């Protein structure tokens, strides 16, 4: 029996080693910028998340084609969208031709206005109607207000916490969060909903 198990154990060990080695080589490419972390899901298909230095709120997808680039969603504010645009050269030198709005909510489409003139913004007809005001003012809807209205209180709370904190490291982290939230509060005022154009 021992002689039968030994080859089986060796075979199992070899298979597990091969699987382990193949997973090491299959690790996705990751590119980090000052504002974003991009993970390549497939060749030319990137998932982008904010690094925390700018309030982005939502993820983005970037598809790099043969001649140009398509971006899915534009983040929560023009400031966050500009940070994304500044980060994209780390992925590609191909121009952005398309921006796709997955839907009209503020955290996916309120960065549209920061994208270069001439790009095609693609979205559902309802997204266009919501962002151009035909179907109500998105800046007055509960979806937007429930997230944007409390930001001033968040800033005040962080100011109070940072001022009272005696631990230097914790105070530094609070001050960084405060900086990001202050910038987000200022960026909210800049939002001008910009609808899809195709």
Model-derived features with residue positions:
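Short, well-ordered coil/turn elements that cap or connect secondary structure elements
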Residues: 33, 42, 115-116
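Short solvent-exposed loop/turn micro-motifs enriched in small/polar/acidic residues
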Residues: 30-32, 54-56, 190-192, 197-198
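Conserved beta-strand hairpin/beta-sheet module of binuclear metal-dependent hydrolase folds
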Residues: 37-90
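N-terminal secretory signal peptides that target proteins for export/translocation
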Residues: 1-8
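Active-site HxH/HxHxD metal-binding segment of metal-dependent hydrolases
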Residues: 80-82, 86-197
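Bacterial N-terminal signal peptides
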Residues: 10-23
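Boundary at the C-terminal end of the N-terminal hydrophobic targeting segment
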Residues: 24-28
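Blade/loop signatures of beta-propeller domains
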Residues: 29-39
């Amino acid at each position: 029996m021992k002689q039968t198990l030994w080859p089986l154990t060796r075979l199992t060990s070899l298979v597990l080693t091969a699987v382990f080695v193949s997973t090491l080589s299959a690790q996705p490419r990751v590119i980090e910028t000052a504002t974003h972390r991009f993970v390549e899901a497939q060749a030319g298909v990137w998932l982008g998340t904010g690094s925390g230095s700018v309030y982005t709120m939502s993820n983005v997808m970037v598809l790099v084609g043969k001649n140009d680039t398509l971006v899915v969603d534009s983040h929560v504010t023009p400031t966050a969208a500009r940070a994304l645009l500044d980060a994209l050269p780390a992925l590609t030198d191909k121009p952005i031709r398309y921006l796709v709005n997955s839907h009209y909510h503020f955290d996916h489409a309120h960065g549209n206005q920061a994208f270069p003139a001439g790009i095609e913004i693609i979205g559902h007809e309802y997204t266009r109607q919501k962002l151009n005001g035909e179907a109500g003012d998105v800046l007055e809807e509960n979806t937007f207000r429930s997230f944007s209205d409390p930001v001033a209180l968040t800033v005040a709370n962080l100011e109070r916490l940072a001022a009272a904190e005696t631990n230097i490291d914790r105070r530094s982290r609070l001050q960084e969060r405060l900086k990001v939230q202050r910038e987000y509060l200022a960026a909210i005022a800049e939002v001008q909903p910009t609808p899809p154009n195709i």
